Structures are given as structure tokens and as C-alpha cells.
Amino acid sequence: MIAFASSLDQGGILAKNIKDAAIALQCISGYDSKDATSIKAEVPNFSEDCESSEFEHVVGLVTDLIHSFGDEDLSKNYGEAIERLEKLKIKTKEIELPNLELSLPVYYVIAPAECSANLSRYDGIRFGYRAENVENLEDLYFKSRGEGFGKETKKRILIGTYCLSSGFYDAYYKKAQKIRNLISSDFVNAFKDVTSVMLPTTSGEAFDLGSITDPVEMYKQDIFTIPANLGGLPATSVPFGEKNNMPLGIQFIGNILEESSLLNISNKFQLGEK
């Protein structure tokens, strides 16, 4: 694993089902004295908790927000997900996340800024790819980073360096951090009444490779998954529904250190049984 945006990064598990994800989470959780991001807390038995019948759930819904995007397929799939919760006799409650739509611009200021700092270590000397046939030290830096980083990575480094540069720090990075706090506060308030929040995973189905050339259009697919990273919250995504023969997904966001409850509701939803 390579640090990209330290305040946003979290390890993700790809699994066939929630139970397998719970088992994997059990293995990677816990305190590590060499990992500054780990905490000294007892690790629950996630694999047992995800199948437990002892959890009481109240799922937060943002139906009006989903409808505001004007995508009928998105609204329809979200509505069908709500119907599944009702069939499972799981309580739901409409909540407000007034700043959620600001997640995208906030993320694309904070993430590149932290990325530009984290990836500065990859200079071809101690870390990362080292170019050959160089004339001097400056040429080594230039060629190693030029050849070693991909186009998207270079783009984000440039954006991040710009946001952190003199005269722009307050206008962009500092302001983005303030809005991030508002987004986090929205979730803190929501979790006073609910145990998890249900959102679509993406705003649409996966697009064909090369079919979208505008990077902003591709970035928009992240609008529902970014809030969890901004708030430092655990989240899961399970397959649900389809569009144009491509799978769609439903996401559950849990409260801080409430992975057991999150895995439990996600498992119930995925199984679709009482």
C-alpha cells in the first residue's frame, strides 16, 4: 500500500460477500506500533457479528437528495433498495445531509494536495522507480518522476501543488477543510437518530473503457463514496440492481468504530432474507 491522501486513505476489501469481507477485516484490524493510523482498541469478532440477530438497525435515507439528481434509474434503484429494507422489517428514517453535494469539489482539493506531499518522496533516490541514462541529479529527478508516474497521478500532483502554493492555500485548501468539517458534522448529527446511512454506490453504471473523455464526468461517479472518506467513516458496497446489463450497487455508511453493526446490516441486505 502506498500513501496517497493520508487523511482520506483506508484499506478496502474486495470479497464475494459480506461474510468474507468480515473475515478479512478481522485479519487486518488491530493495533500496529509501526502504523500511526492504527488505534489501541479491542477488535470485535466481525465474522460472528455480521450474522448476529442482536443488532437493532435504523437506516438513514436521503430520498429527496437522490431524486434531486434527476436520474430516473438512480431513483428507481434506490426506491427498490428501500423496499428490500421494508421487507426485511428494518426501520428507516429520512435524514438531512445538506452538504453532501459539496463532497466532490472538497475531495478534489484535499486529495491532490495531500497526494502532492506524499508522492514527493518518489524521486528515484530512496523510493520508487529510478530512470536510467541520466546526465545529472536534476535529470534523474525529472526523468524518474516523468516516466514513473502515470498521467492521472501527474495531474493530481500538479493540482495539489497549486492548491498548496503561496496565495492559494487559504483560498482552496483551508476552505475545503472547513467544508469537510461541515460534512462530518452532518453525519455526526445523522447518527444521533440512525445506525447507518444508505446511499447509491455510484451515480450510474460502469462506463465502457474510453467512452468518457471528460475527467470531470468520471469524477462525478465518486460523489456518493467520497463522503465516507471525508468523515473518516466505515462503509460497504453490495451489488443491487442493474442498468444496461451492468450491475449497480448500494452503499451503507456506518458510524465511527461501528463496523460490526455496519457489516450486520450489509449482510442482511445482501442476503435479502429475514
Describe the role of every protein-language-model region.
Residues 70-71, 104, 169, 207-210, ...:
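Short glycine-/acidic-enriched loop or helix-start segments at secondary-structure transitions
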Residues 88-107, 203, 242:
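Short connector loops at secondary-structure junctions
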Residues 105-114, 156-164:
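Short, hydrophobic/amphipathic alpha-helical patches that form generic packing surfaces
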